[in-house]
Design a protein with these regions (language model features):
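Active-site bordering "gate/hinge" segments
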Residues: 1-314
Length: 315
């Protein structure tokens, strides 16, 4: 779908029902960046999410939630004014905009024209995965996974599977009046299997997802996740205790990146480097790790969980 469609969806979700038009956005932005504010932005967001859980061969739990809000940020030097409203009514939004800009007591507000940013290459389809299957089909999917897992090995004793989906709309207006929109779908199928042999019980896990619809969870995927979880659990039945103490750890791609993030990721964030409190401050372009170590964080992989068409500042 085109960026025009994405923007149309976000406007029809967050602006049109409340009668918010271009002039209202201009007034809000003018308040947020009122002189002498140096930087500011407005962040609209709605999210709906659901989950389904199967245990003991039955889908026993399901949940649904929705939330919305608008955040206003005004920055003056080292000071940041933040305010938010869970209501999208115009009066509530103007009050929040004024509250955010109150760090500049003598500021004068005005208006700023709003322009739309075009997305060259969306990395995922702006559709709602929650609507991609009806409720009975979601239950059937989990039941099919349960049956598949139990058919793989007689030592399978317990199966817990969950299906989760979310659909988020984001609209960001920066201090230059640039409006950026994004539709963010997400699904996840998670599986936990317990096997037992000669009184020993072990667990295996698997799953996957991304910025996709539930329809992507076809028979091939279900079979893959079932096999991975059962294989892992059976291997654990034969596994020996891991030795204690220090040891070399080899990290692969994907989820091990979480360890990299926790170890050094925060030190790479903008604020720490702007304030020169990071160990990496002033080292842009310099080698900061082993010469045989390269770390690539790619947020542009189509339909991947961590991919974004725009970041949370509209870039």
């Amino acid at each position: 779908m085109s960026n025009q469609t994405t923007e149309a969806i976000t406007r029809s979700t967050m602006l049109d029902p409340y009668g918010i038009d271009e002039s209202d956005l201009q007034m809000m932005l003018g308040q947020v960046i009122s002189s002498p504010i140096e930087m500011g932005d407005i962040y609209f967001q709605t999210v709906e999410a659901e989950s389904w859980t199967l245990e003991d061969g039955l889908v026993k739990k399901s949940s649904y939630s929705s939330r919305q809000g608008v955040g206003f940020r005004s920055i003056l030097g080292e000071q940041t004014g933040l305010a938010y409203s869970e209501s999208f009514e115009k009066d509530a939004l103007m009050k929040a905009a004024k509250a955010a800009s109150s760090i500049a007591k003598s500021g004068k507000s005005g208006t700023l024209p709003i322009s739309t940013r075009n997305l060259d290459q969306p990395y995922y389809v702006p559709s709602n995965p929650i609507l991609s299957l009806d409720d009975q089909s979601k239950i059937n999917l989990l039941n099919k996974l349960d049956v598949k897992v139990r058919s793989l090995d007689s030592r399978v004793k317990e199966v817990v599977a969950s299906l989760a989906g979310s659909y988020g709309c984001v609209m960001i207006i920066d201090q230059e009046g640039k409006l950026s929109s994004d539709i963010r779908p997400m699904i996840r199928l998670s599986l936990s299997v317990i096997v037992e042999d000669n009184g020993r019980r072990e667990r295996g896990t698997s799953g996957g997802g991304g910025r996709l619809s539930y329809e992507s969870l076809n028979d091939e995927k279900i079979g893959q996740y079932a096999q991975e979880a059962v294989d892992q659990a059976l291997i654990n039945l034969e596994a020996k205790e891991a030795p204690a103490g220090e040891m070399t750890v080899v990290l692969g791609s994907g989820w091990p990146g979480v360890l990299i993030h926790e170890a050094i990721g925060h030190g790479l964030e903008g604020d720490f480097n702007r304030k020169k409190t990071s160990a990496f401050s002033g080292l842009m372009g310099e080698m900061v790790a082993s010469p045989i170590c390269n770390i690539v964080d790619d947020g542009t992989i189509p339909e991947a969980r961590g991919s974004l068409n725009i970041d949370d500042e509209g870039n």
